[in-house]
Amino acid sequence: MQEIMAKLEQLENLNDLERLRVEVMGKKGILTQQFALLKNLEGETKKTFAKELNKNKENFEKMLESKRESLLKVQMNENLTKEVVDASLFTALRPKSNGHPIYQTMDRIIDFFVNMNFAIQTGPLVEDDFHNFEALNLPVFHPARDMQDTFYFKDSMLLRTHTSPVQIRTMQSQHIPIRMIAPGSVFRRDYDLTHSPMFHQVEGLVVDEKDKISFVHLKYILEDFLHYMFGDVRIRFRSSFFPFTEPSAEVDISCVFCGGSGCRVCSHTGWLEVLGCGIVNQKVFDAVGHKNVSGYAFGLGVERFAMLLHRVNDLRSFFETDLRVLEQF
């Protein structure tokens, strides 16, 4: 058996290893034939011989497996050495993406406000009724709720209809001063040329001690922002109504399609509505437990801005994954 073990140690490939295994443990192998002799023995002689054979078999199997693992590693290293990849091999270049126009627009919006020291805040897409409606001065039977067709789940949970809940959560968790924007996806049951059931908003909120924030501050930041986005356009603020701000305003810019002279896109008014804003209603501060504070808020639809920046008439073209359209941006 020592001679077999010595032979095993000297083997250099798996084929020779398999031949030795058959030579020792095959049907006509050395150990197999020795085990066959046991039937001719009796008593202690048989017992002693069987014990010795089992020991030899066990030792051989262990050394066989150890040698197999060793040879497999050698073979693997040889294969890896041979399989060299030629990194210089020419391949057809794939066209690079420029980014989706909606996210290009969102990034541009975010960049402006980050440079103005606004922090980015995020929140859950699935919201509860309190954060999405009630805390924003929209109680259960408020008529303004009729303006929003909402995707509801069970137990008063819903897909958020705006990113305003992020403002509520931020005011609940942070102390003043607060200076934040909330970009993200929102959901409403609407789908046509200018509406999508899933779209994107960026809302902003600034809160500080009472009387430190005025409409003048809001007007300044939004005028600066709109000139940054659309260049030398005229801007006007119109009185409006939102339950969560008082006073409230909607902001228009001179039509980017006709320069303000009047066209089909602006309904021949020369103006395009781009966002809503106002001074935060005191009832909103009461809902989150803030006293003696003031602030302003604003919100805009990213798709609306993308359509104006890229002169796109049908919002749905942004979502149809038609490369002929997307490659233009």
Swiss-Prot record:
**Broadest EC class?**
ligase
Cofactor: binding details: Binds 2 magnesium ions per tetramer.
Q: Which reaction does it catalyse?
A: tRNA(Phe) + L-phenylalanine + ATP = L-phenylalanyl-tRNA(Phe) + AMP + diphosphate + H(+)
**Species of the source:** Helicobacter hepaticus (strain ATCC 51449 / 3B1)
Pfam families given in the database record: Phe_tRNA-synt_N, tRNA-synt_2d
Cofactor dependence? Mg(2+)
Listed under GO biological process in this entry are: phenylalanyl-tRNA aminoacylation
**What Gene3D superfamilies does the database record attribute to this sequence?**
Bira Bifunctional Protein, Domain 2
MF terms per GO, please?
A: ATP binding; magnesium ion binding; phenylalanine-tRNA ligase activity; tRNA binding
Tell me the residue numbers annotated for binding Mg(2+).
246
Task: Provide the alphabetized UniProt keywords.
Answer: Aminoacyl-tRNA synthetase, ATP-binding, Cytoplasm, Ligase, Magnesium, Metal-binding, Nucleotide-binding, Protein biosynthesis
Source organism superkingdom: Bacteria
Stated family: Belongs to the class-II aminoacyl-tRNA synthetase family. Phe-tRNA synthetase alpha subunit type 1 subfamily.
* HAMAP family (UniProt xref): Phe_tRNA_synth_alpha1 (MF_00281)
Compartments annotated for it: namely: Cytoplasm
User: Which EC number applies?
Assistant: 6.1.1.20
By what name is this protein known?
A: Phenylalanine--tRNA ligase alpha subunit
